[in-house]
Amino acid sequence: MDKTLVSAIEDAFARYSTLTVEEIEDSIRPTVNRVIDGLETGAFRVAEPDNHGGWKVNEWLKKAVLLYFRVHDTTIVDAQPAPFWDKVESRFSGYDAVKFRAAGVRVVPGAIARRGSYFGKDVVLMPSFTNIGAYVGEGTMIDTWATVGSCAQLGAHCHLSGGAAIGGVLEPLQASPAIIEDHCFIGARSEVVEGVIVGHHSVIGMGVFISQSTRIYNRATGEISYGYVPPYSVVVSGQLPAKDGTHSLYCAVIVKQVDEKTRAKTSINELLRGLAD
């Protein structure tokens, strides 16, 4: 990590509201652009594995993203069928066939990706929205009307189904974006937000909503947890009764956990069938 670069971002962010036009043009804007370029290439990640089975948030990168809005003016962003009026350029602005082939990303008409987002090889972007600072691993499909929020992390070989959303976060700085680890399937119209982590090889069924306050009930153990779905979990929406028995409230239910061999050879539909048994 370039400590000089980190220090420059930290110093500029500490003076966010008092930055002068001269220093923005002379040094801060080029420095911020360098960081955003690093996010696009994958050299930097807002959140990354901590080598202890967890994740760490690089707050200085979130500060750089926020500074991007401070040091850039709103301008015309060319697009079809009509231009945009924004501070953030399109991720693929100025791309030609050579650049698209080098990137290895398939971008379908209607897909919107903002500058500062990263896409691995063989990513497919259907008409969808990916925000600044987001990370999308290789071989992942972002399906129609799906949303990847600012700084959200989506691993390799995942499928974010139609209308699903992965929540991002810029403030507070210490807050983590939603993180979907490798080989996960997120069902249509589901949402994972507020820094929830979905462990690798998990399947989230259609219409499941998980935030930090959502109870996650493990049917096999009876355990209730928050904010984390263990690897190889199959999750659907459900309800848990209130203590007084007068009503029930929404929860996410881990209906089963499968091993690596079963997950590899079993289709998503097969995993989700017979869950009421």
Curated annotation (Swiss-Prot):
CDD domains hit by this protein: LbH_THP_succinylT (cd03350)
UniProt KW keywords: Acyltransferase, Amino-acid biosynthesis, Cytoplasm, Diaminopimelate biosynthesis, Lysine biosynthesis, Repeat, Transferase
A molecular function (GO) term: nucleotidyltransferase activity
Pathway(s) the chain acts in: Amino-acid biosynthesis; L-lysine biosynthesis via DAP pathway; LL-2,6-diaminopimelate from (S)-tetrahydrodipicolinate (succinylase route): step 1/3
Catalytic activity: (S)-2,3,4,5-tetrahydrodipicolinate + succinyl-CoA + H2O = (S)-2-succinylamino-6-oxoheptanedioate + CoA
Main location: cytoplasm
Positions that bind substrate: R106, D143
CC per GO annotation: cytoplasm
Protein family: Belongs to the transferase hexapeptide repeat family.
PANTHER family in UniProt: 2,3,4,5-TETRAHYDROPYRIDINE-2,6-DICARBOXYLATE N-SUCCINYLTRANSFERASE, MOLYBDENUM COFACTOR GUANYLYLTRANSFERASE
UniProt subunit comment: Homotrimer.
Protein name in UniProt: 2,3,4,5-tetrahydropyridine-2,6-dicarboxylate N-succinyltransferase
Gene: dapD
